[in-house]
């Protein structure tokens, strides 16, 4: 019988690959990559947001609280983010366990590289790719400029299909100086 460390390592590698496959599938079904905007006209300008907006970024995986172990396994695997219980039921009958990563560095150095190496398989892959584009703009500190904010809004409006394009255009038109109509604000790339 072989009892070398190589056998143990091979078993661990196989288990890791199985877990990674499970994780990618789980995020395909239950994960979300989101970009949002928070209006902060006064406070934002004091903190370098000349646009009056803060760009919010988040990766989240949600499950019913009975499955909290799955969400905690994901947190343990990545080693970043946090797990919390969300008591908002919305369309659910139970509390929700939510794993989320909001930290820019954690997203750029852990989450994005993982899903670039192990791609998602559903339409969520497109949302991830758009999310990664936005995060790269943010990492270059271009999100604090009008041009960068507009670029992120243009990308974000193609994600998740929750906010209609017109709403994002209105937000930018109303709060971005020197623009007179939506054609001046959002241009296709």
Q: What are these regions, as identified by a protein language model?
A:
Residues 1-189:
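Sequence-level preference for short, compositionally simple segments enriched
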